[in-house]
Structures are given as C-alpha cells and as structure tokens.
Amino acid sequence: MDAGFNIASICIHKGEEPVISGTDGICNIFFAGCNLHCLYCQNHEISQSGSVIRSPGMELEKILDQVVSILSEGIPAVGFVSPSHVVPQVKAIIKGLNLRGYKPVTVYNTNSYDKKETIRGLSGLIDVYLPDYKYVNWEIATEYSDAEDYPAIALKAIKEMYYQKGSTLTFDEDGRAENGLVIRHLVLPGLIVESKDVLKSIAEELSTGVHLSLMSQYHPTSQVINHPILGRSLYKEEYEAVVEAMGVMGFRNGWVQDMDSNQNYRPDFSKEHPFE
C-alpha cells in the first residue's frame, strides 16, 4: 500500500469555497494522476502529464506526519483532491489520522467520475462531499473529457452522495462546513446551454435545496490555448446567464464567483506551495 502513494502536494489551500477553506485554509492532499482526461484541466501539471510529482511512492507515515503538522497549526479540515483513482489510499489516510487521535473534517473533492459503490463505501468516513458535476451531454463529455459515460456515472455518484447527506449543510462556529454536500459546476466558454442543463438535472434528479458552487474560474491553459472554443476565457455575459438560470430554477443555497477568479486559480505544482 505505502509504495502506491503518489502525492503531488500536501499544502494549506485557501482558494476553495468560503465554507470549505474558511479564513485559514484547508489541508489539501493533491494526488497525482486522474481518471478523467479533460482537455482544459486546470491541474494538468499533475493530473495528465505526471511530470510534477513531488513525492512519488510516499509512505503513509510520512503523509500522516505532514498532515498532522498542518492540522497542528489549527487547520480543522483535510481535503482529498482528485481521489477517485486512489480511494483505498484515502481510506488509509483517514484511518491513520484517527489512530493518531486526529479526526478532522474530511472533504472528498472529486470530478464525480466515481462508481456509486465507491461512494457508498465512503459513508461514515467522508464528512463533506465536494463533487464537480461537469456535463449531462455524452457528446460533450466525450469531446472534452474522453468519457462518454461520464453523465450517467456522475449522476449516480452524486445521487449516492445526496442519499447520504441530503440538502442540509451543517457548519461549525466559524461558519465552516462540517457535514453535507456542495455540488460544483465550472461554467465553460461556449457551453451555456450545457451549464443550464446541468442545473436542470440537479433540480429534477436531486433538489433545488442542495448547495451549489457555480464557478467562473475557467482559464485556458497552454493545452487548449489554440482550441476554437476553449482557447478563450469565459465572458461575463455567459456566466451571468447561468447565474440567472440558477435563480429562475429556484436554487436558494450556494455561492457564485467574481469574474476575476480565473486570475486567482493558477497553481504551479513545481513549487512547494503551489498557490503562493
């Protein structure tokens, strides 16, 4: 088990939703690799090329040492980023922390390309699910993420998360999420209809009471800079149209981003602290 922990970064990250990061940040564990192949991935340095792996084959005890060091600074939560392909390792880290006497809020930060059974097996271990619901159209999923079955698989996974957590999001005294579900959606340029269809799917298949995070932080990476659609940033009018649809459909809980957020999320995983 220990030989398989390929870690891209373990760091304090302050760029998640306010209820996830709080003011001090969350201890995020960024795993190398990914089970999706999104053309526009903002973390492509570690998810696709695999060229930036700060700690290949890292031992569990060393991971726990680093996480405990951050938790000891007063950070109350641990996030597992891109964990779908390493779920046994996620479980091992949580159980290892518990054995050391630490029970932080655990956040499963996923692209939602998870089997329903996998999510079911995380019940009782994960406090907050933070899934990204990317597409409902299989053709778009195929073109942009090479995953024709993404819409069906993601919906089943998110339904299981909803079954476990419902629409209620509970908070600690500092306003940080302690338990529940927050569904993310990144609005992509030129795909406004798709974004509205994603919101419609959530409303019809789950509830308009769930907490949503509608993200505007898309930035064209070097991978897609010449792409006819993905090669530009999101227009303000495009994002505002999706925000308006969110309100019209009756969603009442969630967060939206400022349009300059695409300047804030540009990690450099060759650095010890990618977000500084």
Give the residues covered by each predicted segment:
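Short glycine-enriched, charge-decorated loop/helix-capping segments at active-site entrances
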Residues: 45-55, 143-148, 226-233
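Alpha-helix-loop-beta-strand connector modules within alpha/beta enzyme cores
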Residues: 94-105, 156-164, 236-244
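Conserved Radical SAM active-site core
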Residues: 1-128, 137-138
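Anionic-ligand binding region
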Residues: 142-174
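Auxiliary Fe-S-binding modules of radical SAM enzymes
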Residues: 166-276
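Non-cysteine beta-strand/loop elements that form the S-adenosyl-L-methionine
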Residues: 123-138, 209-218
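Conserved radical SAM core fold
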Residues: 47-48, 87, 112-115, 133-151, ...
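Hydrophobic faces of well-ordered beta-strands that scaffold small-molecule active sites
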Residues: 27, 78, 106-108, 129-131, ...
